Amino acid sequence: IELHPYLPQHALVSFCQSRDIHVTAYSPLGSGGSKPCLLEDEEVKKVAGKVGKSVAQVVLKWGIERGTSVIPKTVKVERLKENSMLDFDIDREDMEKISSLGVEKRYVPDFWNSGCFDE
């Protein structure tokens, strides 16, 4: 499921979790070549500065803290290492800020267009 702070799909995640269906976030970092760029979001940058981590690490940790798996794509060894260093916490207030950015941006085309959850 395409899932990141710009497309949190709260209803779909809640539906799945209420039925013990584990959710895996596809494209959890958004898409670097598309606008708006999640990794340039000012609110997420503030949280990253606060916890001393990269924006990508904060976004991945946000996904994990929500109870989802994240599968970021990278071809760079240094990013692969960075993406696995998620041994920090994001406080509740910052989790809520990230969860409510309100952008609603889908980066991956919705081929099925099911519209099940109106998101």
Question: What is the meaning of each model-derived region?
Answer:
Residues 1-119:
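Beta/alpha (TIM)-barrel catalytic core signal, keyed to glycine-rich beta->alpha loops juxtaposed to Asp/Glu
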